[in-house]
Amino acid sequence: MTRYVFITGGVVSSLGKGLASAALAAVLQARGYRVRMRKLDPYLNVDPGTMSPTQHGEVFVTDDGAETDLDLGHYERFTGVPASRADNITTGRIYQDIIAKERRGDYLGATIQVIPHVTNAIKDFVLDGNDSFDFVLVEIGGTVGDIEGLPFFEAIRQLGQELPRGTCCYVHLTLLPYIPSAGELKTKPTQHSVKELRSIGIQPDILLCRCDRPIPMDERRKLALFCNVRQTAVIEALDVASIYEVPLSYRTAGLDREVLGHFGLEHGEEPDLGRWQTIAERVRNPEGEVSIAIVGKYTGLKDAYKSLTEALTHGGISHRVKVNLEWIEAEVFEREDPAPFLEGLNGILVPGGFGQRGAEGKIRAARYAREKRIPYLGICFGMQMAVIEAARSLAGMPEANSTEFGETAEPVVGLLTEWLRGNELERRAAAGDLGGTMRLGAYEAKLDPESKIAQIYGSEQISERHRHRYEVNMAYRERLEAKGLRFSGVSPDGLLPETVEHVGHPWFIGVQFHPELKSRPFEPHPLFKGFVGAAIEQSRLV
């Protein structure tokens, strides 16, 4: 029998529902249960693909090409189970599907309403394809009281009535703020949040209380009394130094036991969290450290690069070192010399992105890394900027650029539908909307067996996730390779470049894909493990 755990949030946003859900899933996995995770996003966008990274954070891409919420990255990293398009849905996508059905006449002339049509669509999504799982954890985005979230709360309320008795559990994540002048944790915001939740028909079974100190017994009793839960169901979610300590913290607090008890399941043997303890110990007690610059355009919101920062942490864990990140806005390098910012650092990473803003700064960062022989990892846009830098500085093409920024005499980077045929720019197909030419999801690549990147992977065949609409122009391959920029990886048909590297440089690699999306704390991605290793070697030269 499949059991459902619905995770909601209250009091304030950004409490970490995604991490809480992923951590609970990890502990249940450690007990031997099969767990699936899903995310319901109340916003009206069809998906986050065209949303600003500075508002929404990163777009997490799945193997099947879905552009999803960054929380799915937490799910994958904590459980090791690849997510898919079937694990994330938005209000926008639900309305899009319902309106399409209405236009086709599928509803036979019925009046389309939020209840039952929208709520039924949400329930169908939650219940689909779960027969092989013991637990399905469903996170509802936003905060209780948000008007756009009401259809989702109504849908999970209905599921609580429609599913067999004892197969649903509602976990409510709230904040217990500490007021220094009063010298105590305040429970009133949580009481009001639960009151709001109960007003729409949902009685939480477990309170997961985010706090910076242990909850005194008096406050526990008060929360249990006024929120109508057992005292044992008031679980403290203490702040911890690393997100990889959260499963250990929840296990200590008894969250997994309370969930199992709610479903009438035996606790059985204690879960084996040995690997989580190893990870937490390595994060707490590194044997060294390196400093790596991230030269990006969305550095104002670190969540815009969430998978990237976690992948670097994984690389550090594998070497037992702490990775210190120096965030640098790429536009700064368009006005100032990069040297004062980059001197003394052990590696430079230029991540993915779109648009001309900051592009020249990223090109200057790539040049600095090449000339100073500092380890460089260029991801997606970062690879393209490294190719433009090589074309300008080494191959005698001072006007080399990307057609993303406008017409250019040397389009070394172009739209996937634009390629140079002779001296003419050929357009294979008319450009559509912003998503029309995007290359999304997992694609295979073959690596040059003599290349550094093939040695890093230990394989000549790889599969990685992509998210881009511009590509390095293969018409320039011969000229660039003559100057030492090896096209070390290509698509299986040989038509699209996937990786480049500077021959003779200690560690300078560009990849068109996003390796950070497949890195796990227990299985660091080879590129990030190699990059951090190269940074360690460079640190010994400083």
UniProtKB/Swiss-Prot annotation:
Q: Name one GO molecular function term.
A: ATP binding
Q: Could you say which residues bind CTP here? A: S13, D146, I147, E148, K186, T187, K188, P189, T190, Q191, K222
Keywords in alphabetical order, please. Answer: ATP-binding, Glutamine amidotransferase, Ligase, Magnesium, Metal-binding, Nucleotide-binding, Pyrimidine biosynthesis
Q: What is its EC number?
A: 6.3.4.2
Q: Which residues bind ATP?
A: S14, L15, G16, K17, G18, L19, D71
Sorted alphabetically, the Gene Ontology cellular component annotations on this record are:
cytosol
Q: Where is this region: Amidoligase domain?
A: 1-265
Amino-acid positions noted as binding L-glutamine in the UniProt annotation, renumbered to this chain: G353, F381, G382, M383, Q384, E404, R469
Q: Where does UTP bind?
A: S13, K186, T187, K188, P189, T190, Q191, K222
Q: In which pathway does it act?
A: Pyrimidine metabolism; CTP biosynthesis via de novo pathway; CTP from UDP: step 2/2
Regulation of catalytic or functional activity: Allosterically activated by GTP, when glutamine is the substrate; GTP has no effect on the reaction when ammonia is the substrate. The allosteric effector GTP functions by stabilizing the protein conformation that binds the tetrahedral intermediate(s) formed during glutamine hydrolysis. Inhibited by the product CTP, via allosteric rather than competitive inhibition.
Looking at the Swiss-Prot or TrEMBL record, what is one Pfam family this protein matches? GATase
Catalytic activity annotation: UTP + L-glutamine + ATP + H2O = CTP + L-glutamate + ADP + phosphate + 2 H(+); L-glutamine + H2O = L-glutamate + NH4(+); UTP + NH4(+) + ATP = CTP + ADP + phosphate + 2 H(+)
Sorted alphabetically, the Gene Ontology BP terms of this entry are:
'de novo' CTP biosynthetic process; pyrimidine nucleobase biosynthetic process
Catalytic site positions? C380 (nucleophile), H514, E516
Binding-site positions, Mg(2+): D71, E139
| Residues annotated as domain Glutamine amidotransferase type-1 | 291-541
Q: How does it assemble?
A: Homotetramer.
- Which function does this protein serve? Catalyzes the ATP-dependent amination of UTP to CTP with either L-glutamine or ammonia as the source of nitrogen. Regulates intracellular CTP levels through interactions with the four ribonucleotide triphosphates.
- Comment field (misc): CTPSs have evolved a hybrid strategy for distinguishing between UTP and CTP. The overlapping regions of the product feedback inhibitory and substrate sites recognize a common feature in both compounds, the triphosphate moiety. To differentiate isosteric substrate and product pyrimidine rings, an additional pocket far from the expected kinase/ligase catalytic site, specifically recognizes the cytosine and ribose portions of the product inhibitor.
> Which family does the UniProt entry place this protein in?
Belongs to the CTP synthase family.
**What protein am I looking at?**
CTP synthase
Q: Which organism is it from?
A: Methylobacterium radiotolerans (strain ATCC 27329 / DSM 1819 / JCM 2831 / NBRC 15690 / NCIMB 10815 / 0-1)
